[in-house]
């Protein structure tokens, strides 16, 4: 690994299972390679997560807070509250909002796009990191279009990047 060349899956598993002094050596090599590649500069973003609904059809347990639409604890924020939270985040120095939520059973086809347009209207300079791959698939399905077309629409609506979770 210290050569900087790609390693095999089997070699990665060996490194992943390292214990004791070997674990410390893996860390030292990783730190050396990082320093060679990018130096000591560390960057970050000030981010606010806006989970606009916890109502979800999946019941997968990933987020641990989802609710069935019939449950009392289920909520869906109005777009005005979502944009208020984005503005508040920006006021406090956030450069990015992460917009994610459950998959509500009665979701309008254009909901995700509308949320992004409203956020960008109110806070044009904020970076929208929005919608998990599962939400994108769900939005495309609800809109009866391909995921490629749906991603294009989300980009046009203001999504800057997408998370890789869920």
List each model region and its residues.
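Generic short alpha-helical segment signal, independent of protein family or function
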Residues: 31-38, 57, 61-68, 87-90
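A broad, structure-centric signal for solvent-exposed, well-ordered loop/edge residues
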Residues: 14, 22, 57-59, 84, ...
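Conserved, mostly hydrophobic/aromatic
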Residues: 4, 30, 60, 99, ...
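A broad, low-specificity signal for short, low-complexity segments enriched in glycine/proline
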Residues: 6-7, 59-61, 123-124
């Amino acid at each position: 690994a210290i050569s900087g060349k790609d390693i095999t899956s089997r070699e990665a598993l060996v490194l992943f299972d390292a214990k004791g002094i070997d674990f410390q050596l893996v860390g030292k090599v990783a730190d050396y390679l990082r320093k060679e590649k990018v130096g000591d500069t560390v960057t970050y973003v000030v981010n606010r997560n806006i989970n606009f609904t916890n109502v979800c059809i999946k019941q997968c347990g990933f987020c641990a807070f989802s609710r069935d639409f019939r449950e009392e604890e289920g909520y869906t924020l109005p777009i005005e509250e979502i944009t208020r939270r984005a503005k508040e985040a920006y006021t406090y120095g956030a450069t990015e909002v992460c917009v994610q939520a459950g998959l509500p059973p009665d979701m309008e086809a254009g909901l995700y796009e509308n949320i992004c347009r409203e956020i960008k209207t109110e806070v044009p300079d904020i970076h929208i990191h929005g919608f998990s791959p599962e939400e994108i698939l769900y939005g495309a399905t609800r809109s009866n279009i391909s995921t490629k077309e749906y991603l294009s629409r989300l980009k046009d609506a203001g999504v800057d990047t997408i998370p890789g979770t869920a």
